[in-house]
Swiss-Prot record:
It catalyses: 4 porphobilinogen + H2O = hydroxymethylbilane + 4 NH4(+). The keyword Transferase applies. Belongs to the HMBS family. This is Porphobilinogen deaminase. Monomer. Its EC number is 2.5.1.61.
Length: 290
């Protein structure tokens, strides 16, 4: 095979993430690859809240069509955007190394989160982030903003927000780590399920799958599978009020989860053998549901 074609979203971050995979393929196999850029439904409807246009697969379905039509050998996704049930024609061939999983605060004026004024306006499009911000500071005014990193930074200025909350992973991959004012403790301010992880999706038994299988990161796979099992048991998606944190502790896996039940955020944790990662995620969800 002379060249691999990898489908991805058009955003700068999606392209940078795909270039990370392309670089790894070049390093391991000395094989060239190129991007096939796709505009997804989630990208087209920037003026509508994600939970109003249906969460599952908004950033994935159009890219999967390119795989079905044999226009690309693989697709690179942020795993937090991938529904817990992948259509039978496809597989998540590899979950690669995980970037910083934390959420961060970017201040409009270099004021730390703990020092922002009473009634400060903070921008986020995530109901998970909004709810956890309110738990930390009930006085905050949450302003919904969507778009890529650059768009949100622009909206922060235009709408005179006191700050915005974003994922550390995207900022670091874009080389914008210097914008971060504060990091939230992921055990207190839980990230999205699979935050910071990249997944490579292929058709089952695809000709090029062997190349992508070589990029699997074992530890990232364990934690992401556990978190996705947790989300599946709750029948949620990346736009539900669900958060998860997981870490490998020797032979064990420690997990924390949050979920909204009737307007109340329920938080539980669990510890167990890491080889039972999928069952652990399921049990954590059952523990939360009571």
């Amino acid at each position: 095979m002379n060249e691999l074609i990898i489908a991805t979203r058009k955003s700068k971050l999606a392209q940078v993430q795909t270039e990370i995979i392309m670089s790894e393929l070049k390093s391991k196999f000395n094989i060239d690859s190129k991007k096939l850029l796709i505009v997804t439904e989630g990208d087209r409807k920037l003026d509508v809240s994600l939970n109003k246009i249906g969460g599952k697969g908004l950033f994935v379905k159009d890219i999967e069509l390119a795989l079905l039509n044999k226009e690309a050998h693989a697709a690179v996704h942020s795993m937090k955007d991938v529904p817990f049930e992948v259509s039978s024609e496809f597989e998540i061939t590899a979950i690669t190394g995980r970037e910083d999983i934390r959420d961060v605060f970017i201040s409009n004026g270099d004021i730390s989160f703990k020092d922002i004024k009473k009634g400060a306006k903070v921008g986020t499009s995530s109901i998970r982030r909004a709810a956890q911000l309110k738990l930390l500071r009930s006085d905050l005014e949450i302003v919904p903003i969507r778009g890529n990193v650059q768009t949100r930074l622009k909206k922060m200025e235009e709408q005179n927000l006191d700050g915005i909350v974003l994922a550390a992973a995207g900022l670091k991959r874009l080389g914008d780590e210097n914008l971060i004012t504060d990091y939230f403790d992921p055990k207190e301010f839980l990230p999205a399920v699979s935050q910071g992880a990249l997944g490579i999706e292929c058709l089952k038994d695809g000709d090029a799958n062997k190349y992508f299988e070589a990029l699997i990161d074992a530890e990232a796979t364990l934690t992401v599978e556990a978190e996705r099992s947790f989300m599946k048991e709750l029948q949620g998606d990346c736009h539900s009020l669900i958060g998860a944190y997981s870490e490998i502790q020797g032979d064990d896996l420690y997990m924390i989860g949050i979920y909204d039940i009737g307007g109340k955020i329920v938080k539980k944790d669990i510890l167990g053998c890491k080889t039972n990662n999928i069952e652990l995620g399921k049990k954590l969800a059952q523990k939360i549901l009571g």
